[in-house]
């Protein structure tokens, strides 16, 4: 099929490699690899990336930097807009993002763009889903015009809102961080937000890093009480992997939940907030 096939006005939160091949000439492909252990995402990109993909520096463009609002608060809208513009992402662009972690990192970029009403999707399966050869050539996109806009309040929940939240709070972290049996150096306390339930985002994926069948993902959320019409807030350590749960919810027809961007790194920093274990 022709690679220049027209892109629909709206796209799902996940697309596969065949979709990307059909539409690649009309898409900005974004490599959003980033590693919690400090390994270089840029280095991974330089060693091999999907042809024509641009590298998105999470620390520079997708995070406001560690501070009172957690380890990775949402960036200033003007900073995000400058980053997108420099990467060739304009107001009318379609973006397909990937990583090498099943999408749990690249989901941050996709969620941010979709929250602003842009066309963006995760490449299901990440870089391994690309059927062709990888490239090492640097990519120098022509700058585009991306208009800065405030992060929509209707897509977010802040720490002070959680106590009165009447819906379901879903923690996307691994079970051992949720139950407090593991406390990372970046965790101010061990445990989780009182009343939260646990759906580890990586359990949305199968053994090769692709999204599990819709029925299985829905069942995982149903086990913690999330059903059609449920009001959901998603959080994680710092607002990155929580975005994968939000995209998964949308993908399986459970609606668009809200993001608590500060995550555990903000919530637990306040000694007045007592962790549940």
Language-model segment annotations:
Residues 1-277:
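Cytosolic catalytic domains that perform sulfur/thiol-centered chemistry
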